[in-house]
Amino acid sequence: MVKIGVLGLQGAVREHVKSVEASGAEAVVVKRIEQLEEIDGLILPGGESTTMRRLIDKYAFMEPLRTFAKSGKPMFGTCAGMILLAKTLIGYEEAHIGAMDITVERNAFGRQKDSFEAALSIKGVGEDFVGVFIRAPYVVNVADDVEVLSMHGERMVAVRQGPFLAASFHPELTDDHRVTAYFVEMVKEAKMKKVV
């Protein structure tokens, strides 16, 4: 069984743990840097990206997270997690982890009162997935090797680049675990390749 960590500094941690377990993997809440060595994949949950960055800096997680990304182990960023994974952020000079060759705009759909749900078609996952958008970012631009998995209107809301997956929405806030299951499969495949 693969072991998937959920970065436990802030955000919808408990919901991600439940979704990972429902998808047949072991879930671990990561609160210490050394735990990164024990896991096969990592979820960066939604939350408030500036608060999350402050906590990442406070607990000296940034370099270990970048090292984890370079190791080739899969990472999945949802909402604020997408912002953490992006190489370029509109209106900000420096990236956070910067593992995905994507450009992201923060709070692109508006503030909290503009939160909404939308039925999405997601490549590799299926139709009618309810995306919960809360002060959501979206992807403005992608490199050639980034696969766009889902659009909402004209906006890219789910993308994949090799071992990295990012979504504007919160897949963990519904009882539909298909997006998490897709990530669990990514982690299983990556682990199999390491064994071979």
From Swiss-Prot:
One of its GO terms (cellular component) is cytosol. L-glutamine binds at residues 47-49, 106, 134-135. Keywords: Glutamine amidotransferase, Hydrolase, Lyase, Pyridoxal phosphate. It comes from the Bacteria. GO terms for molecular function: glutaminase activity; pyridoxal 5'-phosphate synthase (glutamine hydrolysing) activity. Pathway: Cofactor biosynthesis; pyridoxal 5'-phosphate biosynthesis. CDD domains: GATase1_PB. It holds the Pfam family SNO. The active site is at 79 (nucleophile), 170 (charge relay system), 172 (charge relay system). Its EC number is 4.3.3.6, 3.5.1.2. Belongs to the glutaminase PdxT/SNO family. One of its GO terms (biological process) is pyridoxal phosphate biosynthetic process. It catalyses: aldehydo-D-ribose 5-phosphate + D-glyceraldehyde 3-phosphate + L-glutamine = pyridoxal 5'-phosphate + L-glutamate + phosphate + 3 H2O + H(+); L-glutamine + H2O = L-glutamate + NH4(+). In the presence of PdxS, forms a dodecamer of heterodimers. Only shows activity in the heterodimer. This is Pyridoxal 5'-phosphate synthase subunit PdxT. Catalyzes the hydrolysis of glutamine to glutamate and ammonia as part of the biosynthesis of pyridoxal 5'-phosphate. The resulting ammonia molecule is channeled to the active site of PdxS. PROSITE patterns: PDXT_SNO_1, PDXT_SNO_2.
